[in-house]
Design a protein with these regions (language model features):
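Catalytic-site signature of metal-activated, phosphate-bearing donor transferases
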Residues: 1-75, 79
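Flexible helix-coil transition and linker loops at the boundaries of alpha-helical arrays
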Residues: 53-57, 88-102, 116, 130, ...
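Structural register within alpha-helical repeat arrays
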Residues: 67, 108-109, 144, 184, ...
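Residue at a conserved register position within TPR or TPR-like alpha-solenoid repeats
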Residues: 71, 113-114, 148, 188, ...
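Structural motif corresponding to the intra-repeat A-B loop/turn of tetratricopeptide repeats
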Residues: 74, 116-117, 151, 198, ...
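Alpha-helical repeat scaffolds
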Residues: 81-89, 119-132, 156-163, 201-211, ...
Length: 307
């Protein structure tokens, strides 16, 4: 784009025919790495071109965003933040809904603010501007929701993360939702945690099961699932034998790997009634070996349970 991006074209200016082959072809571009990136930093290729472009067009908010990228990549967060804010202040009142450049400007600014320890209310001001200009972009909600979950503001975390997933489902990820699209499992796990902490156990269970169907060895998802099954009261929300039946649908308990994984999660949670059912799937010799190899993982108590 302008001085810093290249694009194909015909020498005589004849328009090119463009075809969308993204379903047929998958191309991974690793960007500038190693020696190429070091050379790029040393000679300041992009930086000089962007500065020249801004000299010629001082109000170009897109170039300001690219300049912020250069400083962000170089680790100069103060300059990066300054140029991202300048870019946002110069943006028009209406943006193209697939304006990936402007979305990146907002996204990187929010990330810098989080790195700098800015208050969440300050970040919400930037979020409000971002969501107003690009209402279909899920990444803004994803970032704020993730930060809220990390700050243990689980109730608000639910709102933002649910909204992020809703936008992703409604509007897709073509030229948008780059972050949430590459952190979908973590988003489900964070949302499940927020739901669990706010008493929405049914939603937490459905989210965890969705994760485990595609990533069965997510300890975070399995732990949250079992925690929701056990509940907070004197009696478990789900009876141990019923919980075991669900685990048998998610895991191949004939596999030692799966049995050990489930046993480890149960032991970590501390649900001895369910642990008894799981230990029944091991031979006495296997249990003896597990106790000697991994002390403390399982108790040495009786394996029977009163029917």
């Amino acid at each position: 784009r302008r001085r810093i991006h290249e694009q194909l074209g015909r020498m005589d200016g004849t328009p090119m025919h463009i075809a969308d082959a993204t379903k047929e072809l998958s191309i991974l571009h690793s960007g500038y790495r190693g020696a190429a990136w070091e050379e790029k930093k040393v000679n300041g290729r992009n930086l000089n071109l962007i500065l020249k472009e801004l000299e010629d067009h001082p109000g170009d908010y897109e170039m300001m965003g690219y300049l912020g990228d250069e400083y962000y990549a170089a680790g100069d967060l103060d300059k990066a933040e300054s140029w991202y804010r300048e870019s946002i202040a110069s943006m028009p009142s209406v943006l193209d809904e697939r304006d990936q450049r402007s979305a990146a400007t907002f996204t990187y600014l929010l990330q810098i603010m989080e790195e700098n320890g800015n208050d969440i209310d300050e970040m919400k001001l930037i979020y409000g501007k971002a969501a107003g200009l690009l209402p279909k972009e899920a990444d803004f909600d994803y970032l704020i929701g993730t930060y809220l979950a990390a700050d243990r503001d689980y109730a608000e975390g639910v709102l933002y993360l649910e909204r992020a997933l809703d936008k992703l489902q409604r509007y897709g990820s073509n030229n948008r939702a780059m972050l949430i699209g590459s952190h979908l499992r973590e988003t489900y796990e964070n949302l499940a945690l927020c739901c669990r902490k706010t008493g929405k156990d049914e939603r937490a269970v459905s989210l965890c099961i969705a994760v485990l169907k595609s990533a069965p060895y997510s300890m975070e998802a399995l732990y949250l699932l079992l925690e929701a099954f056990r509940g907070n009261g004197f009696r478990p929300s789900v009876a141990p034998e019923k919980a075991m039946g669900i685990l048998e649908q998610l895991y191949c308990l004939d596999s030692m790997k799966d049995r050990l994984f489930v046993l480890k999660a149960c032991s970590k949670l501390g649900w001895p009634e369910l642990e008894v059912y799981i230990k029944r799937r091991f031979t006495a010799e296997e249990l003896s070996y597990i106790r000697s190899a991994w002390p403390g993982v399982i108790s040495a108590g009786p394996e029977e349970i009163n029917s």
